[in-house]
Amino acid sequence: MAVITGASSGIGLECVLMLLNQGYKVYALSRHATLCVALNHALCECVDIDVSDSNALKEVFLNISAKEDHCDVLINSAGYGVFGSVEDTPIEEVKKQFSVNFFALCEVVQLCLPLLKNKPYSKIFNLSSIAGRVSMLFLGHYSASKHALEAYSDALRLELKPFNVQVCLIEPGPVKSNWEKTAFENDERKDSVYALEVNAAKSFYSGVYQKALNAKEVAQKIVFLSMSHKIKARYLIGLKTQLLLALYQILPSSWYDSLFRLVVLGRKRDA
């Protein structure tokens, strides 16, 4: 049995479909799960839920626990991005970003762990990002939420080792999905000192997403790992992603910062 959040689109949806094809019973959690025609399957139970709603989450897992005695795989795929400068992004948007990307995930894990502990070598896959290793220009709050997820997952892995529950971080680069549409829907204030650079960065990132990874590629990796006996702590997906991390680790911070700004903005900031 598998539990998947963010199940009605992108990587989450692809994981659901692939695990159903492998004969898994899947609990597909998403805000619009029951509206997703692709999830109409005898082995799939769709649950419409905002994962940041704590009371609703508790009720969902009470219902799951009443029907199931174990969970083989938990895939935390729910999440979104907030784009804009650190200074100008409203703090309520920042709180919402962390509520969905981090705190909701923590609660899903807590609620699912009793079921996961009942199955030896069960697995938790937390969908992080290259932004969890390298902070992105004007994606500071999104990057921060993924950095938090990385630290949390490392601690969780250490704690769950005696119970044979494996914890794995999936760190893809840009993936074709609705993510960029949501992230880029808000414009920086026109009077912001960052407006020109934010717009330049948005154009760059939009171009990157035209050549992004396919969600199916990432899902195939996750599903393959879900059926493997032993897995690593993290998987960085995409050659460009691996190159970016290598540059970040090798170059002095000042060099890396200048190079990153030059690539994204096409110029250095005016003095």
From Swiss-Prot:
Its EC number is 1.-.-.-. Gene3D superfamilies: NAD(P)-binding Rossmann-like Domain (3.40.50.720). Disulfide bonds: none annotated. PROSITE patterns: ADH_SHORT. The active site is at residue 142. The keyword Oxidoreductase applies. It is an enzyme of class 1 (oxidoreductase). InterPro entries: NAD(P)-bd_dom_sf, Sc_DH/Rdtase_CS, SDR_fam. Substrate binds at residue 129. It comes from the Bacteria. NAD(+) binds at residues 1-25. Pfam families: adh_short. This is Probable short-chain type dehydrogenase/reductase VdlC. It comes from Helicobacter pylori (strain J99 / ATCC 700824) (Campylobacter pylori J99). The gene is vdlC.
